[in-house]
Amino acid sequence: MTASYQPQLVFVDGSFAELAQDMASVLQISDEIQPLLDSEKESEALTKIVSESKKLNAIPEKEFTGAYNLLVHLVLQSKEPKKHLPTICQNLTRPVTSSPQHGAQLALFELTSIFNLLKPNDPVRFNVFIQIIRFYKIHSIPISDHLKSALKQLPRWLQSWELDEEDQRKMYSEVIEVMTAAGEEEEAYQHILKALRTFDSEDAEDYTSEEAQQLALRALRSAISSPTRLSFEDIRALPAVHALSESHPVHYQLLQIFGEQDLDDYDDFREEHEGFIEKENLDNEVLYRKMRLLTFASLAAASMQTREISYNSITKALQIPSEDVEMWAIDVIRAGLVEGKLSQKKKVFLIHSVRYRVFGEKQWRQLASSLEKTKKTVSTLLQTLRREEANAQQEAERKLVEASTQHNNDRGNQRRGGNRGQQHRERNDNDD
């Protein structure tokens, strides 16, 4: 947008005085507004109109949108829209008494319109968007795809509004609360991580603050308790989360188990810290299932050299009966941790590929070894192809020589045959 950008509502036309008087009529305060307009006290007139604007929530439903459009237009065309918009937004979060059925949607539409009418880099958008987020929670509105789409742009918006880290966390906190209340756990989790990234990674005092540690704990609990979250590299990479190893060592130990250890380690943890899982309101059944899937993945990663795991190894590591191996193999494949198939005949799981839980020095060595094997295989294949190509070329050349020789021989025979015929005719002529 250019600096000359001016917001404009459709179907709103007229001078300030004319439009202000129209608004005053709707609010039934014309007697108070007209003297101010006559005295050219437009700012005072607008302040009075905005202060009375809560009455718009009680006007007939069919007039609601038009009236609010007019009010918003007056405010946006004024010298101080920032002064008046908070009041309007606050009014819109209140119930629309004239329309119990459609009031929430009408008000949300108006809030969204205000946001869209502001310049993209206008910091006032920050407060309007917070009101939109809160509106969803206040009125228990299901999270729309439109809002989810808007949230993808939120980091860019926050940057364009030039907000400090505290205000950025304020916004993310609002989103987290709304998403949590709506049962959108994954959305909430992702915004917890975004909030944690606003802490200065080079300032220990910042990322070890009480606020940072509480957010880190919330992220940890969310990551561990989620039935579908099977990757923990994103959360473990955050300094605020790593700092939990000092401030909340038991929590951090549990995260480490889910990040890179196995079911036996989880059992040892529960024995060592009896009652901790229950105290944290974590579902042990969900956690146990996750650890079995993660243990299967670790087993597959450790078996990449042979590319197979015996049924016995699976039953022992997962602590399951042999008849359940197929079920867990299917589950780990569906979870995207491992690709492979069962061999009922050999009683093994054949590994095609595996998603490493941790990619460290050991995994780099394994990758280097695998690449070296691939390199040797490709080199051998190229040598074979070149050898076969050379043999084919030699064979083609040999056949070409043979064909040329045969052609020359045939021509020679034809010439010799022609000479003998001519000599025979000459003898016959001489005989005569």
Swiss-Prot record:
Record's subunit section: Component of the eukaryotic translation initiation factor 3 (eIF-3) complex.
Keyword Protein biosynthesis part of the UniProt annotation: yes
Subcellular compartments: Cytoplasm
Function: Component of the eukaryotic translation initiation factor 3 (eIF-3) complex, which is involved in protein synthesis of a specialized repertoire of mRNAs and, together with other initiation factors, stimulates binding of mRNA and methionyl-tRNAi to the 40S ribosome. The eIF-3 complex specifically targets and initiates translation of a subset of mRNAs involved in cell proliferation.
One Pfam match: PCI
SUPFAM superfamilies: ARM repeat
Keyword Nucleus annotated: no
Biased composition (Basic and acidic residues): 392-401, 423-432
Keywords: Cytoplasm, Initiation factor, Protein biosynthesis
Entry similarity comment: Belongs to the eIF-3 subunit M family.
Domain PCI: 184-356
One Gene Ontology term from the biological process aspect of the record: formation of cytoplasmic translation initiation complex
Region (Disordered): 392-432
The name this protein goes by in its record: Eukaryotic translation initiation factor 3 subunit M
GO annotations of cellular component type: eukaryotic 43S preinitiation complex; eukaryotic 48S preinitiation complex; eukaryotic translation initiation factor 3 complex, eIF3m
GO MF term set: translation initiation factor activity
